Amino acid sequence: MMTILLQHTHLKNRLMPFLLALFLAGCTTFLGGGSASLLQSDANANSDFYMNKVYQAQNLEEQHTYKLLAARVLVTENKIPQAQALLNELTTLTDEQVLDKSIIEAHIAAVKQQNTVADTQLKHINLAQLSRSQLARYYDVAARIAENRYDAIEAVKARIQIDQLLSDVSRKQANIDRTWSLLRNANRGVINNTVAEGNIALGGWLALTRAYNQNLSNPAQLSQAIQQWKTAYPTHPAAYLFPTELQGLFNFQQTQFSQVALLLPLSGNAQVIGNTIKAGFDAAKDNSATQVQVFDTAATPVDVIFDQVKQAGIRTVVGPLLKQNVDMLLNNAQLVQGLDVLTLNSTSNERAIGQLCYYGLSPEDEAESAANKMWKDGIRTPSVFVPQNDLGRRTASAFNVRWQQLAATDANIRFYNLPADITYTLDDQNTSGVYIVAMSDQLAEIKTTIDNSGRTTKLYASSRSNSANNAPEYRLLMEGLQFSDIPFFKDVTSNQYKKIEKLTKGDFSLMRLYAMGADAWLLINHFNELRQVPGYNIDGLTGKLSAGANCNIERDMTWFQYQSGGIISLN
């Protein structure tokens, strides 16, 4: 017995160093491992977490590792200057740290649109030395460079490489969604003419995109085409994790209704606005058999109207128009339960609610259109001149959000109380283009100021300045300036234009409202298609209409230019 106990004791003593080493190795793995292990893994925390780790680091190597992790995350948080500042602090690095730093530097260059620099940095990286996580980051930078160059196919090829390296389901889904977004927005000619050349995954993606493009105008057929694609490509990554925005197609039902409620202010202060929108709605309805029941929101509270709508068995609603009434719906979402609702305005409180979409002639649409137009025109340092009021703040915010998406930097926003204020913002501004929101008389003063400054800056304006009262002298003064407005104004010789011009006495503001009413009828008749079919759009009088975030109907504006005393359409 004693012999057995002694043998057990000796065995335990011999095993203790081994067990201790094994335990420590397990702890190292659990706590994140050494520097190389940390850098070779995903950085799932925010930058503040890693900066705190920097201050807790026991030695310089560990400190550098956490600075690299913080810099990596700062780039994804779009905090480029902070990331660069951290990298500049790094001095003596290990080989593993130098390798990881090179990926971060390439990522920063790609975000800053320095594509040649980013490309060169990637080419100097030895792929054999990268972990799966680092390889995924490498190809993510490659995809970003390709996107910067508008090369959707090369970006997709990089995304396919990323998919093979990811194991986390949520990250795989995000990568598939990004891949699909690239293809859906790609030029159709590029999609149709690209050959997969043995790349099975690319071939599947191209087939899915072609099926989508060919059937987009007929969502019922599109749903069938998607099902057929899944049958033909059962092992494709997108067959396992289908693009999120396409998943609703499997339950798609075409828009159908026999009754619709129209909610407008038809008395009181907003009577003219309500009646003009109704006239456009009625004209677009024309001889349709659909029954329209009209409710005056100035005479009856909106919550009462919605109860009446439900009691009448109506399941489709257009309106209300006034912001306070839209906000009331948002605060009492149960009112719209069981209904398809297209409001005729949006508010700052807007959010996604089941069967509800927002439509209106918002300044945000024009601001986003202006940012897109200026970017396409090669403008890289824009200034935005807007009035110091709610309209100006909304316009500036929308323009800047879109500009950040396009250029990864802020636009130069300037608010004014009087047109003369613009003088003080011109002196030291190295701007290549100016977007101006102003009434026509204010715009005339602003343009004169800019012209007199001797600057050769491209000028853009919102529809706010486009008025029927603008005389020939005004149009000559505006020579070269481009402005956005609804496409309805493209053909001023059409019978439809002349009819609406007569009805509204040539008031452009009322003509826009009439066009809005006509498009409200168009939109409600394509309600399910807009909500469920990504990329679905219809050509309306107020723009090319599609559903964006929160089912906010977005309008792609038409651009015009003053030329030799006249106005020409640029679209």
Swiss-Prot record:
InterPro entries: LpoA, Peripla_BP_I, TPR-like_helical_dom_sf. It comes from the Bacteria. It holds the Pfam family LppC. Its main location: membrane. Keywords: Cell outer membrane, Cell shape, Lipoprotein, Membrane, Palmitate, Peptidoglycan synthesis, Signal. Interacts with PBP1a. This is Penicillin-binding protein activator LpoA. It comes from Pasteurella multocida (strain Pm70).
